[in-house]
């Protein structure tokens, strides 16, 4: 193995990951021109596997929040954060702690004025961790398990989840109104579809009831009358109280990798930031590119 190439690869990977770490992403978003907090209270709601780190960075950057809640996966709380209560809950299937912590968040944002700002920090895993079901919790857990076992992709999963929830599909933003929401989103889905990341609690929903019903039929979900009615009920399509800053995405990671390659003297070519397939298929694809360059007498790393 070429030791120099291996060292360069390690450097490129480290530089790329550093650019999309939660703390760096939050600092970047809070320093942007898009962040304009109101004159009133500042509340923080952080949800996802990176919620604690995002909240810790946000509070340090802002100096204070009036009140806050972190909802993250078991084992992911690293300590206390001033003014913030931290909860751990179930992932990838929501549990009673998910439901209880989400209820606390909803209570916190009740009766806010239009002078208040809700800083909403969202990362991967939010669909399970942030949940107030519109159907019995046990039924939601069973449907989630069936979708997981059936091989449903994240878009299919979240299309169903949004309609069975009081906080997903833009409904959390409605609960916060008339307060303004500044949402910082760490994207864990290719293409950054905002309404699908953590099932879009503060984003207008682009999916339809017809799509949800089709997915339910595809995976033969045993729906109660209550659940079936929820799937046909439409979600918010317009939200006027939300500003969203997407960061920490695959696109940003790819750009950081390109910059690191160039710094090391390579001529980088970004083939795609949307590759979605099995690892063996990706390996075959990259191998064919390497063979093409080798056949033309070109160097390729």
Where are the regions a protein language model picked out?
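N-terminal amphipathic/basic leader segments beginning at the initiator methionine
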Residues: 1-41, 45-46, 53, 77, ...
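Short beta-strand segments
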Residues: 45-47, 69-72, 119-124, 183-189, ...
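A glycine- and small-aliphatic-rich helix-loop capping segment at beta-alpha/alpha-beta transitions
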Residues: 57-67, 83-86, 106, 110, ...
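Glycine-rich oxoanion-binding loops at beta->alpha junctions
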Residues: 72-115, 155-156, 160-161
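Internal gly/pro-rich beta-alpha loop/helix module
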Residues: 136-222, 234
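Accessory alpha-helical/coil subdomains and C-terminal extensions
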Residues: 176-182, 204-285, 289-294
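Conserved mixed alpha/beta catalytic, RNA-binding, or beta-rich assembly cores of soluble enzyme
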Residues: 292, 298-301
